[in-house]
Amino acid sequence: MKLPGGTIICARNASSYYDTVIVGGGMVGNAMACSLGANKSFQSKSVLLLDAGRSPSLASFKPGAPFNNRVVATSPTSIDTFKKLGVWDQINSHRTKKVNRLFVFDSCSTSEIEFERGQQEEVAFIIENDLIVGSLYEKLAEYKNVDVKTGAKVEDCSIPNALENMATIKLENGDVIETSLLIGADGVNSKVRHASNLDYTTFNYNQHGLVAIVNIETANGKNETAWQRFTTLGPVALLPLSDTVSGLTWSTSPEEAQRLKQLPSDQFVDELNSALFSQNNQIPLVNQTIFALNRMNPFRTETFGRKAEGTTPPHVITVQDKSRASFPLGFGNAHSYITTRCALIGDAAHRMHPLAGQGVNLGWSDVQILDKVLGDAVREGADIGSITYLREYDSAAQKHNLPVMVSVDLLNRLYRTDAPAIVAARAFGLNAFNSLGPVKNFLMNYLSAHR
C-alpha cells in the first residue's frame, strides 16, 4: 500500500517484487532514487528506496535555526546534477553558502596555494547534509514509479550467482522483497557489499574527523573563502555557512579528537585558533631555502613567494553548543562495484579522506553514471541486473574515482610529516604550482568536472 509522500507499508512476512531496490536513504541513495524516478526510460520500472531512518524535515532549516555539524562542499558538477533533478531551487531557497575561493596553507612552512573562481560561477557551495537529504526526499513524492519505505532496517541480503534468480532483501520486521537489481547505498559498513562477497581493500588512517559549528569574525565582514591548513596530525578546514558561521572539519589523532571534544568551549576555541594561526611548527631553514629557490623560479610573478592580501583565515569566536562530534577516517574501495543483480554506489563502494568535505561528490557521480547505464539497458530491452551492462558502470566509475581517491590519500600522507626535506620539497612544489595561473585554472576546471 502506498501512502502520501511515497511511503509504502508492506504486509508483514509478505514477499513483494520491485525492478530496483535501493538500500540506503542518505544523500547518495536519495539522489539515485530521484534519478531513476526522473529517467524517462525507467518509467515502466518500479523502484523502492529503503531508508533505515526518517527523512529530516525541511522546516528545521528555517532562518536562525542552528546549523547541523555535517556539511559538504558541493562541486559545480554536483550542483548541475541537482538542477537536472529539479531540487536545486528547493535547496538554495533554504540556506547555502557560495565559496568563491579555496585557500590552502601549511603549518610547517610558508607555502600556500589559492584557487579562485575563474570561468565558473563558484568553487563550491557549502550545504548541510540533511538539507540535501530532505530536499531529495520531498522530490521523491512526485515520481509515480518510486516508493519509499522509512524505518526499514535490513536484516539480510541474498545475491544470486546467475540471472535465473532474483536478489532478495529481508527486513528486520520480516518483510521479504525480491528485485532484479539491488543497489547498495548503505554507507561504509554496507550490508549489501558484505552480501555481494565483492573484494574490498580498506585501511584506517588512525585519524578521527572532528566536526563542529563555529562562529567566526572576518576582517571584511564577508565569509566566502574555504580555508584548509595542513598540520602534522591532519588538516583543519573551515567551510563557510554564512558570513558569521563556518563548519569545522578537523582531522587529528583519535586521542586528540576525544580530548578536544571534552574541552570547555573557550579552551576549544583557543586551541582551534592556535591550529589555524600558530607559527610554532615553522621550520626556518626550510622557509629560507624556499625563499632563495623562489627567487630563481622563472615562472614567478610579482606576488610569487609573498603573502597576498586576504590570506589570513577568520578568527573563531565561539563554538556552537553540542555541535562537536567525531568519526574515524579511513580508505576503502571495492575491487568491483558490481556483480550479478547488484551495484554499489557512494560510500558502500568507496571511502576516502574528507579533506574539506569532497567525498560525497564521487557518490553523486556514481549516480549519474549508473542512471545512464540503466536507462540504456531498458531502452535496449536488456535485464537491468545483467553484468553485461553493469560492467559499463563499474568501468566508468572506477576510472573516475580511483585517481581522485589515490591523490587525496597521497596528499594526506605527504602532509602528515614534519621531516625538513619533505616539508621543503612539498612547500616549493606548492608555491611553484601557485604561480602557474593557467595550469592552476586548468586543474580547477578538471577537478570540478571530475569530483
UniProtKB/Swiss-Prot annotation:
<dbReference type="Pfam" id="PF01494">
    <property type="entry name" value="FAD_binding_3"/>
</dbReference>
<keyword id="KW-0274">FAD</keyword>
<dbReference type="GO" id="GO:0120538">
    <property type="term" value="F:2-methoxy-6-polyprenolphenol 4-hydroxylase activity"/>
</dbReference>
<dbReference type="InterPro" id="IPR000689">
    <property type="entry name" value="UbQ_mOase_COQ6"/>
</dbReference>
<dbReference type="InterPro" id="IPR036188">
    <property type="entry name" value="FAD/NAD-bd_sf"/>
</dbReference>
<dbReference type="InterPro" id="IPR002938">
    <property type="entry name" value="FAD-bd"/>
</dbReference>
<keyword id="KW-0503">Monooxygenase</keyword>
<keyword id="KW-0831">Ubiquinone biosynthesis</keyword>
<dbReference type="GO" id="GO:0031314">
    <property type="term" value="C:extrinsic component of mitochondrial inner membrane"/>
</dbReference>
<protein>
    <recommendedName>
        <fullName>Ubiquinone biosynthesis monooxygenase COQ6, mitochondrial</fullName>
        <ecNumber>1.14.15.45</ecNumber>
        <ecNumber>1.14.15.46</ecNumber>
    </recommendedName>
</protein>
<dbReference type="InterPro" id="IPR018168">
    <property type="entry name" value="Ubi_Hdrlase_CS"/>
</dbReference>
<dbReference type="InterPro" id="IPR051205">
    <property type="entry name" value="UbiH/COQ6_monooxygenase"/>
</dbReference>
<keyword id="KW-0560">Oxidoreductase</keyword>
<comment type="similarity">
    <text>Belongs to the UbiH/COQ6 family.</text>
</comment>
<dbReference type="GO" id="GO:0006744">
    <property type="term" value="P:ubiquinone biosynthetic process"/>
</dbReference>
<keyword id="KW-0496">Mitochondrion</keyword>
<dbReference type="GO" id="GO:0016491">
    <property type="term" value="F:oxidoreductase activity"/>
</dbReference>
<dbReference type="GO" id="GO:0005739">
    <property type="term" value="C:mitochondrion"/>
</dbReference>
<keyword id="KW-0999">Mitochondrion inner membrane</keyword>
<keyword id="KW-0472">Membrane</keyword>
<keyword id="KW-0285">Flavoprotein</keyword>
<dbReference type="GO" id="GO:0071949">
    <property type="term" value="F:FAD binding"/>
</dbReference>
<dbReference type="GO" id="GO:0106364">
    <property type="term" value="F:4-hydroxy-3-all-trans-polyprenylbenzoate oxygenase activity"/>
</dbReference>
<dbReference type="InterPro" id="IPR010971">
    <property type="entry name" value="UbiH/COQ6"/>
</dbReference>
<comment type="pathway">
    <text>Cofactor biosynthesis; ubiquinone biosynthesis.</text>
</comment>
<comment type="subunit">
    <text>Component of a multi-subunit COQ enzyme complex.</text>
</comment>
<comment type="function">
    <text>FAD-dependent monooxygenase required for two non-consecutive steps during ubiquinone biosynthesis. Required for the C5-ring hydroxylation during ubiquinone biosynthesis by catalyzing the hydroxylation of 4-hydroxy-3-(all-trans-polyprenyl)benzoic acid to 3,4-dihydroxy-5-(all-trans-polyprenyl)benzoic acid. Also acts downstream of coq4, for the C1-hydroxylation during ubiquinone biosynthesis by catalyzing the hydroxylation of 2-methoxy-6-(all-trans-polyprenyl)phenol to 2-methoxy-6-(all-trans-polyprenyl)benzene-1,4-diol.</text>
</comment>
<dbReference type="GO" id="GO:0016712">
    <property type="term" value="F:oxidoreductase activity, acting on paired donors, with incorporation or reduction of molecular oxygen, reduced flavin or flavoprotein as one donor, and incorporation of one atom of oxygen"/>
</dbReference>
